[in-house]
A protein has these predicted regions:
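Conserved glycine-rich Rossmann-like NAD(P)H-binding loop of the short-chain dehydrogenase/reductase
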Residues: 33-47
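Substrate-binding pocket helix/loop in short-chain dehydrogenase/reductase
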Residues: 97-98, 102-110
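The beta1-alpha1 cofactor-binding region of Rossmann-like NAD(H)/NADP(H)-dependent oxidoreductases
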Residues: 61-71, 103
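Residue(s) in the substrate-gating loop at a strand-loop-helix junction
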Residues: 141
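Conserved glycine-rich cofactor-binding loop
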Residues: 10, 17-18
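Active-site helix of classical SDR
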Residues: 121, 157
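C-terminal helical subdomain
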Residues: 177, 181-182, 201-256
Length: 256
């Protein structure tokens, strides 16, 4: 779509059909990137392709399934032979008391929030290397800083993601592969993740009441109730277009 800050770049965005992921994908295309959209829903991917044109390619992908991730990155490799930017945005969460967590509720969050980035980073690094270096932006959460009642598994998975970022940063910095942890606060338009995982109304009401009582909502949402997804997208462009040789290990983004 013409010249831009990301002209000639190839990007992969997970969770690309809703919330911040959708905004990031759209902004990357506006800046001239060829963007591969990874998400589970075929219809929403097709809608994004129609909206963004030939600069966007949707690949139905379950990031928690290693075979699905391999297949997605094989498409990128076959068509582009390189990758410049990986954005791990896909995530899922819902409020549940810790002692009420089912095995499935635990594993669904681990597969999407932690195993997903592990699988995508593993698949992306050879393609980033082929490009002569690039950027991985992994979206973490203020749940690793603030203690949110009833979001224990979400916090655990995001803390694990931050440890992954640290490890990859050390291992691949000599290859000019930069790994940025984006500790993202509340974004307007975000939900409980892009997988359509329904929230229990009773648990949700209890959780929001606790968060209000604990003062967490006021601290993380600020005066405006959260940051816009467009501002989150703008931040992603900044992170991956800053001068080579400049590292941003951890970025904390929130409303005020």
């Amino acid at each position: 779509m013409g010249e831009g800050l990301l002209s000639g770049k190839v990007a992969v965005v997970t969770g690309a059909t809703s919330g911040s992921g959708r905004a990031i994908a759209k902004r990357f295309v506006q800046e001239g990137a060829q963007v591969y959209l990874l998400a589970r829903g075929k219809e929403r991917l097709q809608e994004m392709e129609e909206q963004l044109g030939s600069s966007a390619v949707g690949i139905p992908t379950d990031v928690g399934d290693p075979d699905s991730v391999r297949a997605a990155f094989e498409v990128v490799d076959q068509q582009q032979h390189k990758l410049d930017v990986l954005v791990n945005n896909a995530a899922i969460y819902r409020p549940v008391p810790f002692d009420g967590l089912s095995d499935d509720e635990i594993m669904v969050q681990f597969r999407c929030n932690l195993l997903g980035p592990i699988y995508t980073c593993r698949a992306a690094i050879p393609l980033l290397r082929a490009a002569g270096g690039g950027d991985i932006i992994n979206t973490s959460s203020e749940a690793t800083i603030e203690s949110f009642a009833m979001l224990s598994m979400y916090a655990v998975t995001k803390a694990g993601l931050e440890a992954l970022c640290q490890a990859l940063r050390t291992e691949y910095e000599q290859e000019d592969i930069r790994v940025t942890t984006l500790v993202q606060g509340v974004a307007l338009g975000e939900g409980g993740g892009s997988t359509g995982w329904a929230w229990d109304p009773e648990h949700s009401a209890t959780a929001f009441q606790r968060w209000e009582q604990d003062g967490i909502m006021r601290r993380i949402a600020g005066r405006y109730g959260g940051q816009s997804v467009d501002s989150v997208a703008e931040l992603h462009v900044f992170i991956c277009t800053r001068p080579r040789g400049q590292k941003l290990d951890v970025v904390r983004s929130r409303s005020y």
